[in-house]
Amino acid sequence: MALKDLFSGFFVVEEEDDELEAPPEENEQQERQQPKQQAQSQNQFTEQPRNVNSERPRSIQSVPKKQSTRLQQSSGERKYQMNNTTSKNNARNVVNMNNQEQENYDFTQESSKMCLFEPRVFSDTQDIADELKNRRATLVNLQRIDKVSAKRIIDFLSGTVYAIGGDIQRVGSDIFLCTPDNVEVAGSITDQIENMEYQGE
């Protein structure tokens, strides 16, 4: 009832001629209340200044609100209420670490996939970048493509790997390993690659 009382004087609605038929008891109550409401709405309408340019009066009119009691509270009470709400919010931020470890384990198993690519044209590079964006490691073999296109592909993949925070490593002559940020590569074979290049020349 308190909520109803709060909004009882907020809007004034004028009765329209098109009314649905109500049971006889309700008709009697409505007939008693109708003159009171009409007189009340006419008094409020005459109190408001009339707008010359308006074509017809509106059926719903706003009534000024009473000042809320919450604005009358002292600042000390407000600070106390703020402190109570923040302590309740902090209590809800507790996270179960076992569930988080299980989710991380599931995600690691799900993303432990490596894709092998041997692009023939530069447009195949977009497929490699899509796999990197999906957090999958890719191994790219550039032995069957010309040197100019291979350089363009490596430049493109270097930018992609940089954007996602991953890494690109050379693991053979014209073979590159591109990894996203969730994959860590241990060890290096740089000496072996350099020896292979010197022997090939």
Swiss-Prot record:
Keywords: Cell cycle, Cell division, Cytoplasm, Septation
Ranges annotated as biased composition (Polar residues): 59-88
Region of interest (Disordered), ranges: 1-94
Entry-linked InterPro entries: Cell_div_SepF, Cell_div_SepF/SepF-rel, SepF-like_sf
Gene3D superfamilies: SepF-like protein
GO cellular component: a single term: cytoplasm
GO biological process, one term: division septum assembly
Assembly notes: Homodimer. Interacts with FtsZ.
PANTHER family membership: CELL DIVISION PROTEIN SEPF
Function: Cell division protein that is part of the divisome complex and is recruited early to the Z-ring. Probably stimulates Z-ring formation, perhaps through the cross-linking of FtsZ protofilaments. Its function overlaps with FtsA.
Family membership noted in the UniProt record: Belongs to the SepF family.
Name recorded for this polypeptide: Cell division protein SepF
Naturally occurring in which organism (per UniProt): Staphylococcus saprophyticus subsp. saprophyticus (strain ATCC 15305 / DSM 20229 / NCIMB 8711 / NCTC 7292 / S-41)
Gene behind this protein: sepF
